[in-house]
Amino acid sequence: RDTDRSRGLGDVYKRQVILSGGIGSRMGSNIPKQYIMVAGRPIISYCIDKFVQSNEIDALVIALDKQWIDFIQPHVAMLQLPVYYAEPGETRQHTIYNALKLIRSHGGVDDDVVIIHDSVRPLVSSQVIHDCICGCIANDAAIATISVKDTIYMSTEGNCITDVPKRSTLHAGQTPEAFKLGKYLKIHEERSYEEIAAVTGGAEFAFRCGMKVFLSKGEELSLIHI
């Protein structure tokens, strides 16, 4: 263990992973959007603050290209918890895998909760964070979601409706996502590089590999990303 402190929910050790490897091409900037300055601070720092202020995490892992470490360090230097840096992978899921291995190498045990959040979603609330962690502790994993309000149409042939799913069964996924370290790391270790590269969603991957994924309550604002 990195620390003897117990914060938040009982004795479960909780480690947050901030994914910060994206390029942010939609904004037409040479600077990745998570590092754009807003009121004198990079966007990623607002995400970090939300989790620190929730008093739910014991350690922070930032997955980012090493060229940005010197830029980020002044914004995390005063945090009263351990901070580690993981290397980004070829895909989002490879980046997550790198972070999981780093956590294990620093004393992570199977029942630790790993909370994953995108660095460009700074509007997440403490309640959403809390509910996601609680859902993970009671199950194998959790993802913040909101109920779908619009009717969703399916088309397996491209042009005409082939099915209309029942709206009450549909949920839109957000971040954070939370996973029990042991089970989530294991399903990565048992898959090939190519299989991990094909993953399009962390919670979907957990579900398809047999983990029980709880749908925790999200918020409309949490859907907004910069």
Where are these regions (language model features)?
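N-terminal glycine-rich phosphate-binding loop and ensuing alpha1 helix
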Residues: 14-69, 83
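Residue-level signal for inorganic ion chemistry
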Residues: 18, 44, 99, 118, ...
